[in-house]
């Protein structure tokens, strides 16, 4: 089943153009994937049960969000750690990397997104706002139009699209593919929640709709 094609662009490189998402024909997964999904779902159920016993769940969640923000930011090249963020939060700023701001912006973005979907479905508008919260007060957000869908070509790996490892769809394809993602987010699907989340994340990363910060936003 084709999920898209690499299409030659006028500029001389090939970009990946996603097909309809999700495909009309339901995606089939191996027994190993279904087994992993069942185990993960069971683990989440246990975690939810344990969480009910924690006296101060808000403190637990805030600490977990800090850890998630630090680890995800580290993957993207941030040098600051969760320990640095905790120290900076109480005013101990000596010897803390300047890019600790990336962790705080990520935390703000997560909190913003969680609050936004309490009274509203998850939409492209909210995703853009989350991206803006994450990027707007950081050095890496300078010149990267936080919260705005890209209008130019980006690429992954290499120094230009011609020698890149992967070139996402060109900007003029984004309205269509992002509309598919938004519909998939909010319409009933024949997939378990975890598999649906995995499909959404993979498609979002394939599309790479922002100039930067796609991994953490996705």
What is each of the regions a protein language model found here?
Residues 1-218:
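FIC/Doc superfamily catalytic core
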């Amino acid at each position: 089943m084709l999920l898209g094609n690499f299409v030659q662009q006028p500029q001389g490189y090939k970009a990946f153009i996603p097909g309809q998402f999700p495909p009309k024909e339901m995606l089939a997964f191996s027994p190993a994937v279904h087994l992993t999904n069942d185990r993960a779902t069971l683990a989440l159920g246990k975690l939810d049960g344990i969480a009910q016993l924690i006296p101060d769940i808000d403190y637990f969640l805030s600490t977990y969000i800090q850890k998630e923000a630090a680890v995800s930011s580290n993957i993207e090249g941030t040098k600051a750690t969760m320990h640095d963020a905790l120290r900076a939060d109480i005013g101990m700023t000596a010897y803390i990397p300047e890019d600790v701001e990336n962790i705080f912006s990520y935390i703000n973005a997560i909190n913003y997104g969680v609050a936004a979907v309490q009274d509203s479905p998850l939409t492209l508008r909210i995703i853009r706002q989350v991206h803006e919260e994450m990027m707007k007060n950081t050095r890496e957000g300078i010149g990267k139009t936080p919260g705005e869908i890209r209008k130019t070509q980006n690429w992954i790996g290499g120094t230009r699209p011609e020698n890149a490892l992967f070139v996402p769809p060109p900007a003029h394809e984004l309205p269509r593919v992002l509309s598919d993602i938004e519909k998939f987010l909010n319409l009933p699907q024949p997939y378990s929640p975890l598999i649906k989340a995995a499909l959404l994340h993979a498609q979002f990363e394939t599309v790479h709709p922002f100039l930067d910060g796609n991994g953490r936003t996705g």
